[in-house]
């Protein structure tokens, strides 16, 4: 879990546009962010296995 202080700090408007970055909407993780789903890879995997993301299923070939 991300520290609460870092999440709050990131939500403030930044002085420069390049300082803005995405965080997972669920856990606040800043790395491995999937833009299409708005969450990190770990949360994506957890929610996909639970079937909570519509249209996503485990690949098999």
UniProtKB/Swiss-Prot annotation:
Zn(2+) binds at residues 24, 27, 40, 43. Keywords: Metal-binding, Ribonucleoprotein, Ribosomal protein, RNA-binding, rRNA-binding, Zinc. PANTHER family: 30S RIBOSOMAL PROTEIN S14 (PTHR19836), SMALL RIBOSOMAL SUBUNIT PROTEIN US14M (PTHR19836:SF19). InterPro entries: Ribosomal_uS14 (IPR001209), Ribosomal_uS14_bact (IPR023053), Ribosomal_uS14_CS (IPR018271), Ribosomal_uS14_sf (IPR043140). Binds 1 zinc ion per subunit. PROSITE patterns: RIBOSOMAL_S14. One of its GO terms (molecular function) is structural constituent of ribosome. Part of the 30S ribosomal subunit. Contacts proteins S3 and S10. Binds 16S rRNA, required for the assembly of 30S particles and may also be responsible for determining the conformation of the 16S rRNA at the A site. It holds the Pfam family Ribosomal_S14. The lineage of its organism: Bacteria, Bacillati, Bacillota, Clostridia, Thermoanaerobacterales. This is Small ribosomal subunit protein uS14. Its cofactor is Zn(2+). Belongs to the universal ribosomal protein uS14 family. Zinc-binding uS14 subfamily. GO terms for biological process: translation. One of its GO terms (cellular component) is small ribosomal subunit.
């Amino acid at each position: 879990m991300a520290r609460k202080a870092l999440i709050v700090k990131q939500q403030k408007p930044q002085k420069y546009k390049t300082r803005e970055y995405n965080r997972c909407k669920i856990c606040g993780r800043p790395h491995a962010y999937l833009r299409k789903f708005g969450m990190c890879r770990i949360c994506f995997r957890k929610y996909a296995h639970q079937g909570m993301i519509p249209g996503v299923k485990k690949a098999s070939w």
